[in-house]
């Protein structure tokens, strides 16, 4: 998994709907994030971390934010 938004939401007893309301995005968008179909921009990851009161590294693997360049 690239991000752990789903896991952290569950730990905090928060729903996808709650997160979508907080961020002003559609529940469909949040659903794509939690299933790792697509990833939110880094600014959104930071906002999600704030909302859930966790560190950014609790939400996402480092490689997602800073992918290794293919040589």
How would you name each of these model-derived features?
Residues 3-22:
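Short basic helix-loop element that most often maps to the first helix and adjoining turn
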Residues 18, 29, 58:
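Residues in the helix-turn-helix
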Residues 25-39:
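Recognition helix of helix-turn-helix/homeodomain-like DNA-binding domains
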